[in-house]
Each structure stands twice: as C-alpha cells, then as structure tokens.
UniProtKB/Swiss-Prot annotation:
SUPFAM superfamilies: UDP-Glycosyltransferase/glycogen phosphorylase
Residues with glycosylation annotation: 89, 297, 435
InterPro entries xref list: UDP-glycosyltransferase, UDP_glucos_trans, UDP_glycos_trans_CS
Transmembrane stretches, start-end: 493-509
Provenance organism: Rattus norvegicus (Rat)
Record flagged with keyword Endoplasmic reticulum: yes
Enzyme class: transferase
The protein's name: UDP-glucuronosyltransferase 1A1
Signal peptide: 1-29
GO BP, sorted A to Z: acute-phase response; animal organ regeneration; bilirubin conjugation; biphenyl catabolic process; cellular response to estradiol stimulus; cellular response to ethanol; cellular response to glucocorticoid stimulus; cellular response to hormone stimulus
Its membrane topology: Single-pass membrane protein
Top-level taxonomic group: Eukaryota
Length: 535
C-alpha cells in the first residue's frame, strides 16, 4: 500500500516540478514600465506586453487621460495622468490628418498647411509630455516603484526623458524615426550612395539624379525636424538639469526593436543593438465570424478583394469615392471595403461596406485574391505574411517608401490616390489578380519572411527580458557614441598624416633646392667670374 501511495505522490509531484521548471519563476519576474504612443503604434505593441505578462512580469502602462486606443487591459496595469487636452482634440487631429491627404490645393499651400498642422499637433503632444514630467507626485510614485526597464516608442521621445530621469535601461519599439534620427542615435552607418532617405521614394539602386535627391534630403531633413523634436530637447534640459539634445536622449537605449525585415526593406548596415522584428503584427489567423464567412463563401470561384485605407481615413471626397466604387464594380470579385464615410451612390452589388473587418484573417483565407491598402507597415506585412498581391495607395509618411519597396519586388502596383481614375484602379486590380507573376513574387517573399529560427514576437520578448535581467546591454553599445564628430570620421588622424606628408614633401623639396643651388649655382658663378677676368 505504501509503495502505491509513494508512486501516486510521485506522479502528482511530477507536473508540479515541470511547472516550476518551465513556468514563469517569481524570482525572475520583473517590473516593466511602458510609455506608448496612441494609434497603430500602441496596437502593435500589445502582443509584446501580453506575452511578458503571461511570463510572470508585472507591466505598468502610463498614458494621458485623453487617449483613443490606449485603454484598460486585463494583462497590464493602467495609470493615467492629466493633460491639458481632451479626447475630442486627439480624435480631431487624427480625422484632420486623414482628410488632408485628399486636399487638391497647390503644392506650396499644402506644404504650409502641413507645416502648420505638424506644429500644432506637436505642440499638443509636447504639452502632454510636459504635464507628465512636471507632475511631481506622479513621477515620484514611478520612482518608488523600482522598475527594471522601460519600453517605449521613441517616435515621441517623452519616454526617453522618463527613462533618463528614472535611470532605467530603455528598450525602443519602432518602425523608423523621421529624419533618420534612429540611424543617427545608434551611430549606424547609412551611405547615401545606396541607402535611400525616408520620403525619397528612391530604391537602393539610384542613378546620379536620384543620388543628388538623396543628398539634398539628407542636408535639409534635420532643419525640417526641428519643428517637432527640438522642443523635447529643451524640455529634457529643464527636467534633467543638463544640456541635452534629442540625439542625447535617444542614444542611451539598450535595444532598438525595429519592426523591419530585409524581405521588405533594402539591405543596409545595422548595429549590434538593433533587432529586426518585422511582421510582429502578423498574428495567427483566426476563424472568420459567420458574417464574414458568408461573404467569402458567396464570392464563389472569383474570391474576394480586401480594401482598407487604415483607421485614419474615415471619409473620402464624394467624387473620389464614386470613382473607386465604379472601378470596384467592374471586377468579378467580391470586395470587402472598410469604410465609415458616406456610402457612394453608385456602389455595386459586389462591394460590401463594413465599419471594421478582420484584415489579417481575411487575407489569410484561400479566397483572398488582392489587397487594396494605404501601404502602412501593418498592412504591408500582413500582405506579405499571407501572400496576397497588393494595389497600394500611399497617403502620407513612410507609406510612399513602403509602396516603392513592394513595387520593386514585383509584389504589387502603386497608384496615386489623388490622380488615379476608375480605369487606373480597375486595370491595377486586374493586373495583380490575373498576372501570375505578382502572386508568385508575393508568395516568394512570404516564404522568405517566414523562414526564420524564431518568431518576431518571441524575439522581441526575449530582448525585453534580457534588458530587464541584465539592467541594460552596455556591451552592445559601440564606442562611436563616445567620439567627437571629427574623431568618428578620423579627420584628426587624416590631418595629422597629411601634415606629416606635407612636412616630408617640404623637407625633400628644400633639400633638393639646396642641393641644386650647391651643384649648379656654384659652377655658374665660377664661369661668370672667369669670363670677367679675360676681359
């Protein structure tokens, strides 16, 4: 009987031991502070936070009281701080941005409008950051919480200021930063001869004029970005009680989690603390709801086209919406169009308007034939993951560059949403659906993207935990951060060697000149004196 009891106890203890060994250990659990940015930036970060919580870590998210997407969650603790603006102001800023892309104003007027909007929105966001940093009670409570690390999106460097104020190692979660601030802050080489600048629409194989364009953008982008980023340097200088620039704020980051992949991006140099996690938002596809399953099944052999211009575009001008509706009505596929604006009067029977759609799940369905997208990084990677050729209508920001990259890889067709006609959209859709090369190219990219030793989400979680365990990753920080600009480019060494060469040349020249005078100058004087004596 005792033998049986001992055997039963052993069997009961075995799962417990396995849980202790394989499960999250309380002794290794850490505390992570998260300072996100509202919108798609936050939505892409949620998977990492959820995984960290499931592994036993305590996650605290801080956000302004006026937030659209950042809400309470079951796998993190939410702490909100007061700001001098309301939810309506944030919503209005997003709506105005989506509406402005369809403006047909002259170029210079659009530039002025964009500049004023960027300045206005930046001022609002800066005021929110300032209210956080000047909230002494709130900041003191964060300091007393003894976090192990900070996870933030450096697109707005408020989290970077908090990290330095609390002396926390920082992990950055981003796609890219404007004006190549990410490359500058990481000291990452980016030769202008083959690394295209953001917003240039160049490829990595540039002709002479494209390289000239690349150089001009490089020379002017820092000036343009001062509107957004220089005030953060001034705010940080006040809070940290030392003179700092935005580059000084960003460069101490331990790890840069970049939502990039060389399947989409052109090959270029990267630094040891830059980790590529492109496709992290490509979640495992789920079963469709009855509503969407019915739409897909009703499409028959022709299949479906998924159409979304992102959450920022809530309304399209009537004339443009009717042109789009006309083009969609000319194809045999069923079109699922995510659109919250006014229903076009000429909407065809094959086009279904929905206020929301499970984009990744629909793209993962075997009947998905094409994807009409605004070329945001989320949509591009979901198109790659699921192997669906794209018709791209970039609207602003890095979307133009994303579309260019996919087009050069033969995975889609790009249209100018302002200039395109119904015929253009119809032809583009028929091209990517009927020309097999587009499907073959996107499937090849999908295969390359998925052929990796570790999933992007697991890789991101590993590096966040790594920084929490080791209190940073200083061994990955290059010494370039500690050099002056002339030391980095070895200008002092070049100057020193040049001085030596010039000195040697000068000495040799003087020696030769002296020798020539001795050899030839003396004979001349002797001959001259001899002639004078004969006379």
């Amino acid at each position: 009987m005792s033998v049986v009891c001992r055997s039963s106890c052993s069997l009961l203890l075995l799962p417990c031991l396995l849980l202790c060994v394989l499960g999250p250990s309380a002794s290794h659990a850490g505390k992570l502070l998260v300072i996100p940015i509202d919108g798609s930036h936050w939505l892409s970060m949620l998977g990492v936070i959820q995984q960290l919580q499931q592994k036993g870590h305590e996650v605290v998210v801080i956000a302004p009281e006026a937030s659209i997407h950042i809400k309470e969650g079951s796998f993190y603790t939410m702490r909100k701080y007061p700001v001098p603006f309301q939810n309506e102001n944030v919503t209005a800023a997003f709506v105005e941005l989506g509406r402005s892309v369809f403006d047909q104003d002259p170029f210079l007027l659009r530039v002025v409008k964009t500049y004023n909007k960027v300045k206005r929105d930046s001022s609002m966001l800066l005021s929110g950051c300032s209210h956080l940093l000047h909230n002494a009670e709130f900041m003191a409570s964060l300091e007393q919480s003894h976090f192990d690390a900070l996870l933030t999106d450096p697109f707005l460097p408020c989290g970077s200021i908090v990290a330095q104020y609390l002396s926390l190692p920082a992990v950055y979660f981003l796609n890219a930063l404007p004006c190549s601030l990410d490359l500058e802050a990481t000291q990452c080489p980016a030769p202008l001869s083959y690394v295209p600048k953001s917003l240039s629409s160049n490829t990595d194989r540039m002709n002479f004029l494209q390289r000239v364009k690349n150089m001009i953008i490089a020379l002017t982008e820092n000036f343009l970005c001062r509107v957004v980023y220089s005030p953060y340097g001034s705010l940080a200088t006040e809070i940290l009680q030392k003179e700092v620039t935005v580059k000084d704020l960003l460069s101490p980051a331990s790890i840069w989690l970049m939502r990039n992949d060389f399947v989409k991006d052109y090959p270029r140099p990267i630094m040891p603390n830059m980790v590529f996690i492109g496709g992290i938002n490509c979640l495992q596809k789920k079963a469709l709801s009855q509503e969407f399953e019915a739409y897909v099944n009703a499409s028959g052999e022709h299949g479906i086209v998924v159409f979304s211009l992102g959450s920022m575009v809530s309304e399209i001008p009537e004339k443009k919406a009717m042109e789009i509706a006309e083009a969609l009505g000319r194809i045999p596929q069923t079109v699922l169009w995510r659109y919250t604006g006014t229903r076009p009067s000429n909407l065809a029977k094959n086009t279904i308007l929905v206020k929301w759609l499970p984009q990744n799940d629909l793209l993962g369905h075997p009947k998905a034939r094409a994807f009409i997208t605004h070329s945001g990084s989320h949509g591009i990677y979901e198109g790659i993951c699921n192997g669906v050729p794209m018709v791209m209508m970039p609207l602003f920001g890095d979307q133009m560059d994303n579309a260019k990259r996919m087009e050069t890889r033969g995975a889609g067709v790009t249209l100018n949403v302002l200039e395109m006609t119904a015929d253009d959209l119809e032809n583009a859709l028929k091209t990517v659906i009927n020309n097999k090369s587009y499907k073959e190219n996107i499937m090849r990219l999908s295969s390359l993207h998925k052929d990796r030793p570790i999933e992007p989400l697991d890789l991101a979680v590993f590096w966040v935990e790594y920084v929490m365990r080791h209190k940073g990753a200083p061994h990955l920080r290059p010494a370039a951060h500690d050099l002056t600009w002339y030391q980095y480019h070895s200008l002092d060494v070049i100057g020193f060697l040049l001085a030596i060469v010039l000195t040697v040349v000068f000495i040799v020249y003087k020696s030769c000149a002296y020798g020539c005078r001795k050899c030839f100058g003396g004979k001349g004087r002797v001959k001259k004196s001899h002639k004078s004596k004969t006379h």
